[in-house]
Design a protein with these regions (language model features):
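Conserved short submotifs of the Hanks-type protein kinase catalytic core
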Residues: 86-103
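Conserved activation segment of eukaryotic-like protein kinases, specifically the C-terminal portion
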Residues: 167-181
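ATP-binding glycine-rich loop module of kinase domains
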Residues: 24-60
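Conserved catalytic-loop aspartate of Hanks-type protein kinases
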Residues: 192
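Activation segment signature within eukaryotic-like protein kinase domains
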Residues: 119-120
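Catalytic-loop of the protein kinase fold
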Residues: 131-147
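Conserved HxN/HPN-centered segment at the entrance to the catalytic loop
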Residues: 66-85
Length: 268
């Protein structure tokens, strides 16, 4: 991915850190290296314990999973922060990833059903592969499905945990939270699938769900969510219904079931 002495080739280093993130010690930069664009992700050591723990967990996940020969992991590099000349005052590690596009960024109006099917199928295949390796992603959202060189990749593994030992603390984005998480249940394969269902529903319907508070999100997910799709993509309703069941026992139990549903009902 990068030359060994890449640090001396960094150009146009630009901070894209949100103020709220900076307050918690999290920093993001974009840069160019040999005419290719990259993201640099960094956590200030000892600034905020939870953020640091999550970041270190993500670094370890990258180190561990690279030996599994998966096709949904971006090429990456982890380096000491002080090897980057512009960041020599920083301690700790930096995660470097290539710049990517949003996998679900395209308007469905410009795509035929076969293109939409392939987009959804690729995302479900990646989720299936992650789960089959024994992991829950734990932070499924639209921006964590990326396109690089026309292929799908997953990113942001800070909340990724082994299925056998999920987090006891539910730390999730309310927009994507399965109903059971609002009641204190641990994350699971099925909460990943519910979150993916929300990603898919917003993309297929071309609208964003709206809520003003954590309580409002809880009411929406636990009581009020009603799937309404344009006629042009009604073929995907059975898939969404299985992903977005409010009762966990009625939801798909794994991503393989979702793929089977997609195949059966798409007629493509």
């Amino acid at each position: 991915m990068l030359k060994h002495d890449f640090a001396s080739h960094i150009e146009n280093l630009k901070s894209v850190t949100k103020p709220k993130s900076a307050d918690l010690g999290r920093h993001l930069w974009t840069c160019a290296i040999d005419a290719h664009h990259y993201w640099l992700k960094y956590q200030v050591p000892h600034a905020y314990a939870q953020n640091e723990q999550d970041f270190l967990h993500e670094l370890q996940f990258y180190e561990d999973i690279q030996h599994k020969n998966v096709n949904w992991l971006l090429p990456f590099k982890i380096v000491d922060a002080d090897t980057v000349s512009q960041l020599q005052q920083h301690e700790g590690k930096i995660l470097i990833l290539p710049d990517t596009e949003d996998w679900f960024d395209r308007s469905i109006a410009k795509q035929n059903l076969k293109d939409i099917y392939e987009t959804v199928f690729s995302a479900l295949k990646a989720l299936t592969a992650l789960h089959e390796l024994g992991w829950i992603h734990g932070d499924i959202k639209r921006e964590h499905f990326r396109k690089f060189e026309q292929q799908l990749y997953l990113i942001d593994f800070e909340k990724t945990r082994l299925i056998s030992s999920p987090d006891s603390i539910v730390d999730a984005t309310p927009r994507y939270m399965a109903p059971e998480l609002f009641h204190g249940a641990s994350k699971s394969i099925q909460s990943d699938l519910y979150a993916f269902g929300i990603v898919l529903y917003e993309w297929l319907s071309q609208m964003r769900l709206q809520a003003n508070s954590y309580h409002d999100w809880a009411v929406l997910h636990c009581q009020n969510l009603d799937i309404q799709l344009p006629d042009s993509v009604q073929v995907f309703y059975p898939l969404l219904s299985g992903l977005l069941q409010k009762q966990q026992k009625n939801r798909f139990s794994n991503a393989f079931e979702a793929i089977n549903c997609l195949k059966v009902h798409s007629n493509l």
